[in-house]
Amino acid sequence: LDNLEPGNELVVVTRNGPTTYYLGADEPAGFDYELVRAFAEAEDMSLRVKVAFTLEEVFETLQRGEAHVAAAGLTQSTERDQLFESTQSYLDQQPVVVYKAGQYKPRSIEDLTDLDIVIMQGSQHAIRLNLLRELNPAVRWRVLETAESSAVMSAINRGEADVALLDSGEFSMQQRLYPRVAKAFELQTTLNTVWYLGSDPRAGEWREKANDFLSAAKSDGTLKRAEQAYFGNVAYASRIESFTFQRAVRTKLPKWQPLIEKVAHE
């Protein structure tokens, strides 16, 4: 990898999703993408994005030294910090328990007993569930082999699980597409969202540059504008639009899904 210097290439690994990276109508978009693009511009570097299909793949890409930065809505953890350098937090989230409206609504941790819980592969929610299971062995969960929160929301929407744990930001964005999936309650803890730096002797230097950028982004309003653009108007999204989209997914997607999946894995 090139060093983070003007004229060089910044390589970022991320995952697909509305809060991270996706292909919009005309160009790439996503909250994390907007930030790393601004970072590349601030450093006068070109940007190359690598998309991982699982959270494990995100960190494997860093471990192999194939990316400078992982910007994928990653929550900070002691386990991850032992392996990689991390930046300061740029977004605070909360873990939320979600369920399908009209079904049983848990209202507290105690209500999770004997429910079928699903989480995203590689997410830090497994750590929290392990702690809960120490207090209550009846707490059980399954891991979905995906890095996309939409797959978790879809599982709840189709009735394939009782509840799921998601980060609050991802849930807010995805609820627009899955209006029948609702928040049951929040876990009373704050999740610090950070970038992780690649496995490289220069990672400490890269961390300083990234932190300088994030500090400036907080001061000059860049971060606030990105938050407003991706999270600010979610609560006002049209439910009719959401149901219309869901109907199109049910009726039109099956015809094209095999081809889409084939191309995605090529």
Region locations from a protein language model:
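Extracytoplasmic small-molecule ligand-binding "clamshell" domains
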Residues: 1-74, 78-82, 142-146, 156, ...
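Periplasmic-binding protein-like
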Residues: 15-16, 88-102, 150, 175-212, ...
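Ligand-binding cleft/hinge of the Venus flytrap
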Residues: 22-25, 33-46, 86-88, 125-146, ...
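Short beta-strand->loop
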Residues: 14, 23-28, 115-122, 246-250
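Pocket-lining segment of extracytoplasmic ligand-binding domains
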Residues: 96-177
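Export/targeting segments at the very N-terminus of extracytoplasmic proteins
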Residues: 234-266
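Extended ligand-binding regions for polar small-molecule ligands
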Residues: 1-2, 30-42, 101-126, 170, ...
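A ligand-binding cleft/hinge motif common to bilobed small-molecule-binding domains
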Residues: 56, 60-63, 71-83, 128-132, ...
